[in-house]
Structure formats: C-alpha cells, structure tokens
Amino acid sequence: MDSEIAVDCSPLLKIYKSGRIERLMGEATVPPSSEPQNGVVSKDVVYSADNNLSVRIYLPEKAAAETDSKLPLLVYFHGGGFIIETAFSPTYHTFLTTSVSASNCVAVSVDYRRAPEHPISVPFDDSWTALKWVFTHITGSGQEDWLNKHADFSRVFLSGDSAGANIVHHMAMRAAKEKLSPGLNDTGISGIILLHPYFWSKTPIDEKDTKDETLRMKIEAFWMMASPNSKDGTDDPLLNVVQSESVDLSGLGCGKVLVMVAEKDALVRQGWGYAAKLEKSGWKGEVEVVESEGEDHVFHLLKPECDNAIEVMHKFSGFIKGGN
C-alpha cells in the first residue's frame, strides 16, 4: 500500500495511498551561520513554540558590531506553491544573504507549515503569527536582540516570491485591518515587493494570458492540493485576487509596491493585472512593474548570477534602500 501512488505531481511531490507525502524538491536545508557569508551573519529563532516554527534572521556583519545601527527591516516569505520549499533551503538562504548584503537591511525569513498536511489557511495564519511576532520588537523589548537593536520599524518591507508573494499581499491587506502593534497608528509597512506573484483564475486574465488548458488544469490541481476546501477552485479570492470582484485592493496596507514578473512565466499577466487593478482601486500609493525579458518563473533563484537576476537584485535592493 505504501508504494502505491495516489497523486503524482512530479517533479514536485508524490502522495501515496497510505497518506505518505514524498517531496521531490525543496527539502534540503542549510544551517544559519555565525561566520559571515557575503558579509552577512544569520541565526534561527523560534516564533511559535506551539507549532515548532522558526524564522531565520539575517544581519550585516558590520551592523552586528555596532550597538546603535538601525537598518530597514525586510520580512520575507518563501515560495513553493504553499507545498514545497522552506525558509532554510540553500536557495532561500543564498537569496536572503545576497539581499541583505545588497540592501544593507535586517531580514526575517519566515518558515510556515505547508500543505497538504496543513492546508490553506494554515500558511497564512502562520505567516500572520510570524509578522505579529516581528512587531513585538517595535519598542526594543522583544525576544530577539538583533531586532531590538537594529530593526528600524519606520522602514518595514514585506517580500516573497510566487506563493510567498501571494502571502505578502494578504499580509498587507490584513495589516490595514488589524494593528500589528499596540499604539501603531498605521499598518507599519512601508512597501511590498511581489516577485512573480502566484495569483490565478479559471479563465485567462486578458488576450495575452496563457490559454494552454493542460497547464491551467495542472495549476488548478496544484492549488486544490494546497486548498482542498476551496469551493471555487482557482477562483477562490485567496488566489484569484486580480479578477475576483469581491477583492478590493484600495485598502492595501502600504505606500508603495514593486511587482516583478518574467516574460515567459505563466503568471506574468497576473502580475501586470494586479498592478493595473491596484492603480484603478483608489489606493493612494505608488506601484511599479518590472518585467524580465526572456525569463521564466523564479529564474532569479535558479540562476542568481545571470544578468537579469543581477538586475532583479538591483531593483529589489534599491526599493528597500529608497526608504519610505
């Protein structure tokens, strides 16, 4: 029974009839490092003891040696369709180390429980718990000294790729409705960066959107694996952010947005559509879209040394260093 496959989503994962889940990628991890890597040190800190969940915190080595160095704060949510990858994988450790070095910021990379064992909305709930934990440091009296001493809570940025970008959107919306810290008058978020955001719908978003039915069916099946209780499938407002009439973006809880998309990515039109909907919503901030020509989904993670990935990092770090 344990060898009989119920669902085969290779090269991502397999689910066996016994209920066992075999993830085929994104399971490797690397430890944090007290020795500088690219000028950055890191450590893991528990944010939810009840669920055994941690964040990985990154800090420029030079800031660690100073007691009064306040830096922008980046909170990052990893991608993987809500199903694969972790905050501790070599891919994300490398990306966050590079991001912190380029942006001269403090970063908190959030690990959350994954579907299908923990279906949506668990990844969103864990992410919100992590974000609230981060903001317990706003007065300088939180659990983690690196955040108490070095995080500038007037310059907080959220970012994520793919499913992580989806999480970022929902965190920014929720932050506009619920205070992240007592006494905080606004959301506490300066801006968000959505890297190849995972939004989708049953029907193409426009005439340029992919009409490949096989691909669209695969994406729907993958979503239903993560969110089996979604009555509307990929038209669930958690995923169909762009076309759903029930989703109002006017209350997005930040002042500026950077959306980064890739020309060959099936999700490219969703990113453009998100920005267009945001501009039309009555939201008062500024939004910019940057498209990487000739590239596919999360290419910047897969080949970080290519010219287009270097340009992505340049835009990414510039957004953070630009402040409010």
UniProtKB/Swiss-Prot annotation:
<keyword id="KW-0378">Hydrolase</keyword>
<dbReference type="GO" id="GO:0005829">
    <property type="term" value="C:cytosol"/>
</dbReference>
<dbReference type="InterPro" id="IPR050466">
    <property type="entry name" value="Carboxylest/Gibb_receptor"/>
</dbReference>
<dbReference type="InterPro" id="IPR013094">
    <property type="entry name" value="AB_hydrolase_3"/>
</dbReference>
<feature type="active site">
    <location>
        <position position="265"/>
    </location>
</feature>
<comment type="function">
    <text>Carboxylesterase acting on esters with varying acyl chain length.</text>
</comment>
<dbReference type="InterPro" id="IPR033140">
    <property type="entry name" value="Lipase_GDXG_put_SER_AS"/>
</dbReference>
<dbReference type="Pfam" id="PF07859">
    <property type="entry name" value="Abhydrolase_3"/>
</dbReference>
<feature type="active site">
    <location>
        <position position="162"/>
    </location>
</feature>
<dbReference type="InterPro" id="IPR029058">
    <property type="entry name" value="AB_hydrolase_fold"/>
</dbReference>
<dbReference type="GO" id="GO:0106435">
    <property type="term" value="F:carboxylesterase activity"/>
</dbReference>
<comment type="similarity">
    <text>Belongs to the 'GDXG' lipolytic enzyme family.</text>
</comment>
<dbReference type="GO" id="GO:0005737">
    <property type="term" value="C:cytoplasm"/>
</dbReference>
<protein>
    <recommendedName>
        <fullName>Probable carboxylesterase 12</fullName>
        <ecNumber>3.1.1.1</ecNumber>
    </recommendedName>
</protein>
<feature type="short sequence motif" description="Involved in the stabilization of the negatively charged intermediate by the formation of the oxyanion hole">
    <location>
        <begin position="78"/>
        <end position="80"/>
    </location>
</feature>
<feature type="active site">
    <location>
        <position position="297"/>
    </location>
</feature>
<keyword id="KW-0719">Serine esterase</keyword>
<dbReference type="GO" id="GO:0052689">
    <property type="term" value="F:carboxylic ester hydrolase activity"/>
</dbReference>
<keyword id="KW-0007">Acetylation</keyword>
<feature type="modified residue" description="N-acetylmethionine">
    <location>
        <position position="1"/>
    </location>
</feature>
